[in-house]
Amino acid sequence: MEKTYNPQDIEQPLYEHWEKQGYFKPNGDESKESFCIMIPPPNVTGSLHMGHAFQQTIMDTMIRYQRMQGKNTLWQVGTDHAGIATQMVVERKIAAEEGKTRHDYGRDAFIDKIWQWKAESGGTITRQMRRLGNSVDWERERFTMDEGLSNAVKEVFVRLYKEDLIYRGKRLVNWDPKLRTAISDLEVENRESKGSMWHIRYPLADGAKTADGKDYLVVATTRPETILGDTGVAVNPEDPRYQSLIGKFVILPLVNRRIPIVGDEHADMEKGTGCVKITPAHDFNDYEVGKRHALPMINILTFDGDIRESAEVFDTKGEESDVYSSEIPAEFQKLERFAARKAVVAAVDALGLLEEIKPHDLTVPYGDRGGVVIEPMLTDQWYVRADVLAKPAVEAVENGDIQFVPKQYENMYFSWMRDIQDWCISRQLWWGHRIPAWYDNDGNVYVGRTEDEVRQENNLGADVALRQDEDVLDTWFSSALWTFSTLGWPENTDALRQFHPTSVMVSGFDIIFFWIARMIMMTMHFIKDENGKPQVPFHTVYMTGLIRDDEGQKMSKSKGNVIDPLDMVDGISLPELLEKRTGNMMQPQMAEKIRKRTEKQFPNGIEPHGTDALRFTLAALASTGRDINWDMKRLEGYRNFCNKLWNASRFVLMNTEEQDCGFNGGEMTLSLADRWILAEFNQTVKAYRDALDSFRFDIAAGILYEFTWNQFCDWYLELTKPVMTGGSESELRGTRHTLVTVLEGLLRLAHPIIPFITETIWQRVKVICGITADTIMLQPFPEYNAAQVDEAALADTEWLKQAIVAVRNIRAEMNIAPGKPLELLLRGCSEEAVRRVNDNRSFLQTLARLESITVLPADDKGPVSVTKIIDGAELLIPMAGLINKDDELARLAKEVAKIEGEIARIEGKLSNEGFVARAPEAVIAKEREKLDGYAEAKAKLIEQQAVISAL
């Protein structure tokens, strides 16, 4: 094996070999249990970020673990067409390169442009996924707009429409005036903002008066421009100030519309003036009030968010109505919405109707992609009736057919599902699944899979002109079908039979409603088992937290704290990293701050660590459902782990290759250390499997680290040295056999988390074991063997380790050179301790560097020594001749003085009121921790001074 571990030399060639050999495919053995994970399809526009790397490491670990258990294993891969995101990327590209808009191209040519762009750039993310070692079946890769998935989408739409579970309605939606499309509640970002509350007088009609004799009501609003669309004023029915006015009318300023005063609990007596203007076409709460009181709806805005030339007037059901005039005063027509706000306020003021303006804190909705203020807009949209679909989906989680890990996410799921709103599924975009609905010139709607089908089913001749709906479906509509559409539905395929329901879904909690809930609803409606019972899409949902930076901040381009997972694999120089973080910024003014922070954090850029170290770190940080603060030090630690495993394997190979390791017969004698490591290994296998089976990847990673680093490398390899240098033939054979057997088993154990290094080493080790198989990927996963857990060997070795560590600690405390042989005395020994010394003298002498071991009678005072108590004996190391008493006392006095200086410095800091008041809690806690550490170190040094003074 190469002397040094260089991941960059082994990882890519190995992955190409695995893929070429077809190791990622299901084994096709239907007699075996199947195991299937559907990858959450990343956006085709995207590139790999830490969230992907985290989730995909978890998925690949599960897939490799199950594959090694012989299961028929499928990891289904694919990408999402990502409607808005992709359309925006391509629109920006043609604007920058050609100065054109999509309208210059026209719909068909623009869509061709997107397909062309996908062909050029769409492969970035899948190339990056290969770098992570993902063992997905690439031959089954799907795209949410490919032909099969498009057919599934049409099939679902048509069936739901025919069951009256999809309908078209005029409803209020979140409208993005920049992107000119409806967006979902989940794509709206609410931002806190300082604004104003305008108090405006609405004159009462027909000579009516308020309880205190005024001939007007004062209405408070944060959006005066929408006055033009008011159709009512609400007061609380319990409010004594206005009770007598319910059923009367006001005259709306500026447009002179006569609108009713209604009694509704939406009006809060304690807030503002207690009178609320009702604009059903431009506010979600007002829309509900309008429905309760049958108020008309007046839309005053264009899709760009400008004031219309004439309003659209509808009744409560959304039918066109002439109950009010559609006239809008000329001075407001075509004004941009925020300019209209100023103009309306000025006009109201000129009429003497502006009572006052108060500063007001408010929450403003922004589109998370377009970045502009969202308008509630009355539009014709397509909806799914969600309550019918939600019922079985709630029951599936209630009765345990689907389990969330961790369980607390079930509550989040229930709270949304039990109060579910109809789902708006249409989007005013060009890129996506076009809605399979056609209209004739009379406005009749026909739904079908194709235009031909529509004509046939409805007996429409070629002379009837039909035009297809311009809108596309919400991206999440096709994603909701992901678990079954990828397996060939609506055909009844073998893949669907073998792999559905799937086993586990790994997802971030942020898309539990967007995606998880909708998959459960859609799957249970369309997929039934042989008994007609609805099938769930998956049995377990494993929820991950978010990966944050080392300070707990969310990673984002605008903060400049994003770390590309592949930069940790391959390394990146500081100039390249700075370019990545500060180039093409939406907010260039942040660049300097980001540059300083990056230079401080990564003065030399990022070293290459390799994929395995990255995967190990991600697994180790995966505590269920919690957000993770990324830690570069942990990454370095796991890179060192890979190095340690590599070097340990070289040691094993150097001592076993071309040697008799007992695989072809011959007598074998196992030493205490051999029996101990086999027992430790089996206990590790049991605990590790339990951790993986319960999705505790963090615990599994910890178990693997502890066994490999501490037991196998630090102890067992050392304990083999006495046998290697002086053992009999059968003892040598036994130890070599154990070295190779445990290493080979350990490689299989670690393979799901760190696949590259384990395969590389295993290819060398398998030759010694006489294994002829091609790859570790398809080897059986280690199983717990209780017969190999030798309790006596475990107890004896733990005692030996205790004794060796005690001697090593004395060396360190007394500043004795590690190589200097020592005399060891044991006093007050139990019979068990005497037996352990006599049986394992060579281990003790070699590992503790002892020239002699003497057992003293219990009452023997012995020479002046440093002592340690261990189980069943007192250890003494005589000090005479080992150290120069005066020099050592002087050294210790110097150490004590240095520590006292540090203690005084920190105590001074902590007694400074200014520091304590200003410094963050974490900084103060760190200083206190340091203080405790120094106090402990000082106590130890004083103890040593006492021992040496007595010599």
UniProtKB/Swiss-Prot annotation:
One term of GO molecular function: ATP binding
Coiled-coil residue spans: 882-944
This protein's UniProt keywords: Aminoacyl-tRNA synthetase, ATP-binding, Coiled coil, Cytoplasm, Ligase, Nucleotide-binding, Protein biosynthesis
Residues the entry annotates as binding ATP: K557
Organism of this sequence: Salmonella typhimurium (strain LT2 / SGSC1412 / ATCC 700720)
PANTHER family: VALINE--TRNA LIGASE, CHLOROPLASTIC_MITOCHONDRIAL 2, VALYL-TRNA SYNTHETASES
Family matches, as PROSITE patterns: AA_TRNA_LIGASE_I
Catalytic activity: tRNA(Val) + L-valine + ATP = L-valyl-tRNA(Val) + AMP + diphosphate
Pfam families xref list: Anticodon_1 (PF08264), tRNA-synt_1 (PF00133), Val_tRNA-synt_C (PF10458)
GO cellular component annotations of the record: cytosol
Protein name: Valine--tRNA ligase
GO biological process: valyl-tRNA aminoacylation
Role description: Catalyzes the attachment of valine to tRNA(Val). As ValRS can inadvertently accommodate and process structurally similar amino acids such as threonine, to avoid such errors, it has a 'posttransfer' editing activity that hydrolyzes mischarged Thr-tRNA(Val) in a tRNA-dependent manner.
HAMAP family reported in the protein's UniProt record: Val_tRNA_synth_type1 (MF_02004)
Family stated for the protein in its record: Belongs to the class-I aminoacyl-tRNA synthetase family. ValS type 1 subfamily.
Enzyme Commission number(s): 6.1.1.9
Motif ('KMSKS' region): 554-558
Record keyword ATP-binding present: yes
tRNA processing in keyword set: no
Motif residue range(s): 'HIGH' region: 42-52
Main subcellular location: cytoplasm
Localization per Swiss-Prot or TrEMBL: Cytoplasm
SUPFAM superfamilies: Anticodon-binding domain of a subclass of class I aminoacyl-tRNA synthetases, Nucleotidylyl transferase, tRNA-binding arm, ValRS/IleRS/LeuRS editing domain
Domain text: ValRS has two distinct active sites: one for aminoacylation and one for editing. The misactivated threonine is translocated from the active site to the editing site. The C-terminal coiled-coil domain is crucial for aminoacylation activity.
Enzyme class: ligase
Subunit annotation: Monomer.
